[in-house]
Regions:
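Rossmann-like dinucleotide-binding core of oxidoreductases
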Residues: 146-223, 227-229, 313-343
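Glycine-rich, N-terminal phosphate-binding loop of Rossmann-like dinucleotide-binding domains
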Residues: 10, 97, 110-111, 154, ...
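Beta1-alpha1 glycine-rich phosphate/pyrophosphate-binding loop at the start
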Residues: 1-77, 161-206
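A Rossmann-like FAD-binding core segment of flavoenzymes
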Residues: 33-37, 76-86, 178-281
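C-terminal, flexible cofactor-proximal segment of oxidoreductases
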Residues: 325-396
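FAD-binding core/adjacent interface of flavoenzyme oxidoreductases
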Residues: 1-3, 76-183, 258
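Short gly/ser/thr-rich secondary-structure transition/capping motifs
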Residues: 18-20, 88-92, 132, 237-244, ...
């Protein structure tokens, strides 16, 4: 009987995994033994990290959007039909259209979403770069500011040891902001204040979620005159008076609030009953090695949806996708998964407009900070403008 593999989500995780599966299972597909299908809530594919460049007017945004169908191998059936129900007992997902998508193997790659409403006043008084709409809004403010204070805040999920989306992004954008304001000739008149919560995964009273990087950041920030303060866990924002208040009892006024807002899993995941995350955040309980949803034999997950202590970023997905694809292929062929995820993350951080820093880590080793360089920035920009689309197609 033909086996059906269903991928829910047309972002980086879903697209890479679908294409990798199509390649690995081509013999079975050609023998009509396997069927691959993807459902997504959009006909478009968005390269999410591109929004960061829009915030500093280094990109317009349209260059980071492609037709989703064009990124998928022809062997993959694609449907624009937002998932509204997941039934793991009967092995189906229901779309908004009412159509039922049956599966033998399910891959949940639904990502995460901004949940600014979780902090009172943040939606009204804050800005962020985690969406193209948000990036365009904050870009207008950055382009107009002549003097004052830009406050940077970072929020973590309530669920222990789960990071926010793209852990290095607040540092990247703080450094990019310094360069951008310098380009505009107003840096001397604009104060940048970078804050970090008291508790950030395994780190307390630091400036980053991993200790080695946290220890070097004060020197990095001091070199570009960025003020920094730990122990500032954002609790609420007064949008009218432009004041941010922390759980620790501190308050900081601002002219622009650039925040890493709270995040949560997609609504279909939060409504599924599969998550054990705190505060209905929706992160899926994930086996750290196989990337299966814990307790479910035929359901995998990867990317921003998981509850693992690794970055919710493309550099993580790039290594996870092979594990998921290889394990499903092995289960079909041998009856059991064969690969184990080691927590590896590989990326290049944009540490300013013209400086890039390669970074890598896994479950055993934290990021070891390395010098940033123009070559690193060239690598990152090259990936943004071309190599990403090859990676999404499963070619890298």
């Amino acid at each position: 009987m033909k086996k059906k593999i269903l991928i829910v989500g047309g972002g980086t995780a879903g697209t890479m995994t679908a294409n990798n599966l199509a390649k690995k299972l081509m013999p079975e597909i050609e023998r009509n033994e396997v069927e691959l299908a993807m459902i997504s809530d959009s006909k478009n594919h968005y390269y999410r990290p591109g929004a960061m460049y829009v915030a500093f007017q280094k990109a317009a945004g349209h260059e980071f959007i492609r037709d989703q169908r064009s990124l998928l191998m022809p062997e993959i059936d694609f449907f624009v039909d937002p998932a509204i129900e997941i039934n793991v007992k009967a092995n189906y997902v229901k779309g908004k259209s009412g159509k039922r998508y049956d599966y033998d193997f399910l891959i949940l790659a639904t990502g995460c979403e901004v949940a600014a409403e979780r902090i009172p006043g943040l939606a009204e008084g804050g800005d962020w770069f985690y969406s193209y709409e948000g990036a365009k809004k904050i870009a207008e403010k950055f382009a107009k500011i002549q003097s004052g204070r830009i406050l940077v805040t970072v929020n973590f999920p309530k669920t222990p040891n789960v990071p926010h989306q793209c852990g290095i992004a607040p540092v990247e954008t703080t450094m990019m902001l310094h360069d951008y304001l310098t380009e505009r000739g107003v840096r001397e008149n604009v104060e940048i204040v970078y804050t970090y919560p008291t508790k950030a995964q395994a780190v307390e009273n630091g400036l980053f979620l991993q200790s080695p990087t946290s220890k070097v950041l004060p020197t990095v920030f001091d070199s570009v005159r960025v003020k920094h303060e730990t122990g500032f866990t954002l609790a609420r924002v007064d949008p009218e008076n432009k004041i941010a208040y922390s759980e620790e009892g501190k308050s900081i006024s601002f002219d622009i609030l650039m925040s890493t807002p709270p995040f949560q899993a997609a609504k279909v995941i939060r409504d599924s009953g599969l998550s054990k995350a705190l505060d209905n955040e929706g992160w899926l309980p994930t086996d750290k090695k196989t990337l299966k949803v814990i307790g479910l034999k035929n359901v995998y997950t990867l990317g921003d949806t998981v509850d693992l202590p690794v970055s919710k970023a493309g550099g993580t997905i790039h290594t996870q996708t092979d594990i998921v694809a290889d394990n499903i292929a092995a289960e079909l062929r041998y009856g059991y998964p064969t690969e184990s995820y080691d927590g590896k993350v590989i990326a290049v951080a944009q540490m300013g407009l013209t400086c890039g820093m390669p970074l890598w880590y896994d479950y055993q080793e934290d990021v070891q900070p390395t010098p940033c360089s123009k070559l690193g920035s060239f690598m990152r920009l090259g990936f943004n403008k071309g190599l990403y689309w090859a990676a999404a197609r499963g070619m890298l």
